[in-house]
């Protein structure tokens, strides 16, 4: 599945979370590729793990849940679904040299376009250059701020033993940068 040439993933339809994950994916592809070129499989594996777990699973999937609900806008839902599948596919491609059998199994179950590689072993290596048009540093900063606030709330809940089900009044004060 590709973002390039996709009607559903025209940049104007991407929300800040979409732009953020694509920006982070772009950076991850560059870093993992460099680690593989240096034969540093440990750092490559750690970078993939950090991205997949801490950014894709912990944040992007959480951001996506509201956009996937029954009452969500169908066009927005389609963009979100496409991005989820695209990013997961890229993670599998990055991870394939380290875990070939598991990644092939997961990839085999994923939705694919007609011209997609039938197996990861023959799929093209992710190219950060293809994602350059989707890089958005403003979105990256905005989502980093959201993650920081949510992290602070989670920390406070843990520190004081407050259940995640308990509503907390939260106020965020931001400096006027204008």
Regions found by a protein language model. Name each.
Residues 1-5:
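Single conserved hydrophobic/aromatic residue that forms the stacking wall/gate
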Residues 6-33, 61-152, 166, 171-176:
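Acidic, turn-prone loop/beta-hairpin segments
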Residues 36-43:
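Short helix-adjacent coil turns
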Residues 45, 49:
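Aromatic-lined ligand-binding clefts that engage carbohydrates, nucleic acids, or primary amines
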Residues 152-158:
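Glycine-rich, charged/polar anion/phosphate-binding loops
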């Amino acid at each position: 599945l590709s973002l390039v040439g996709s009607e559903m993933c025209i940049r104007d339809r991407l929300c800040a979370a979409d732009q953020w994950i694509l920006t982070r994916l772009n950076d991850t592809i560059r870093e993992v590729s460099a680690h593989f070129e240096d034969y540093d499989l440990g750092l490559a594996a750690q970078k993939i793990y950090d991205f997949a777990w801490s950014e894709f699973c912990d944040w992007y999937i959480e951001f996506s849940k509201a956009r996937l609900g029954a009452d969500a806008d169908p066009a927005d839902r389609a963009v979100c679904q496409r991005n989820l599948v695209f990013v997961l596919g890229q993670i599998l491609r990055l991870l394939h040299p380290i875990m070939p059998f598991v990644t092939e199994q997961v990839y085999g179950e994923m939705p694919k376009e007609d011209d997609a590689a039938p197996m990861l072993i023959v799929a093209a290596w992710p190219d950060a250059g293809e994602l350059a048009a989707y890089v958005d540093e403003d979105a990256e900063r905005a989502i980093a701020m959201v993650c920081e606030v949510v992290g602070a709330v989670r920390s406070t809940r843990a520190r004081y033993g407050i259940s995640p089900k308990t509503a907390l009044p939260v106020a965020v004060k931001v400096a006027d940068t204008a």
